[in-house]
A protein has these predicted regions:
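Long, charge-rich alpha-helical interaction segments
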Residues: 1-55
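Glycine- and acidic-residue-biased ligand/ion/polar-headgroup-sensing regions
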Residues: 40-42, 46-50, 54-60, 90-93, ...
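Positively charged, Gly/Ser-enriched RNA/tRNA-binding surfaces
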Residues: 42-47, 53-85
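Short acidic-glycine-tyrosine-enriched beta hairpin
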Residues: 68-80, 85-88, 95, 156, ...
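Short, glycine-/Ser/Thr-/acidic-enriched flexible segments
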Residues: 78, 86, 94-95, 102-104, ...
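C-terminal, non-catalytic macromolecule-binding modules
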Residues: 93-143
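Conserved short histidine dyad/triad with adjacent acidic residue
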Residues: 139, 152-169, 195-196
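C-terminal structured domains
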Residues: 141-151
Length: 198
């Protein structure tokens, strides 16, 4: 870690490769040895690392808080991450939206396969400070200002008083209920129910 701090960005890729290739027993030993220091310093990244080590014993993904930005989002806030950017959701409820893709790579904190060579070849090793996006409010719609044209994301908070029209020619719309219930009506009069359980 001292080398990473001293060399900066040029040390990031070799450090990440070293972490990714650590055997599970070495991950456990390293994190166990760091435990007293973590309790003493109480740094957010170290505390998250300790929590992940307990939840995913032997998984090198537990080191992620040392390599990634810890970002805390309030309800309604969002992040936009470009392709090739590693990320993880540590707690809470989130909705992930991405453009059409069949190349999702896992980096850890999972029982699923981690394709380490492909991951190392694909990840963008760069210093990044993610910007928290806050919605633009227009009536019952909260639109997230996403900096790409591939898709858009907005949250609707129906109040029963204001009808809302969505869609346009050639657009695909997905409605996902996070809480409550709403009844959309199509142009032809067909209705259906969308709620948190649907």
């Amino acid at each position: 870690i001292l080398e990473l701090e001293a060399r900066g960005l040029e040390a990031l890729e070799p450090f990440y490769q070293w972490v990714l290739e650590l055997p599970a027993d070495e991950v456990r030993r390293t994190l166990a040895a760091a435990a007293p220091s973590i309790k003493y310093h109480k740094q957010p990244a170290l505390l998250e690392m300790a929590r992940l080590a307990r939840a995913y014993p032997g998984d090198s993904g537990a080191f992620a808080p040392l390599l990634l930005n810890l970002v805390y989002l309030n309800p309604g806030e969002s992040l936009f991450l470009p392709a090739r950017t590693p990320h993880a959701y540590l707690r809470g409820t989130g909705v992930e939206v991405m453009a059409c893709s069949d190349n999702v790579l896992r980096a850890g904190l999972t029982d699923k396969h981690v394709d380490k060579p492909e991951l190392l070849a694909t990840v963008e090793f760069a210093i990044m400070y993610p910007q928290v996006l806050r919605p633009d409010y227009v009536g019952i719609e909260q639109e997230i200002p996403i900096p790409v044209a591939d898709f858009r994301l907005s949250f609707l908070r129906p109040d029963g008083q204001h009808p809302f029209s969505v869609g346009g020619q050639g657009e695909i719309e997905l409605l996902y209920g996070l809480c409550g219930q709403m009844t959309p009506t199509a142009a032809d009069g067909e209705t259906w129910s969308v709620g948190a359980a649907d």
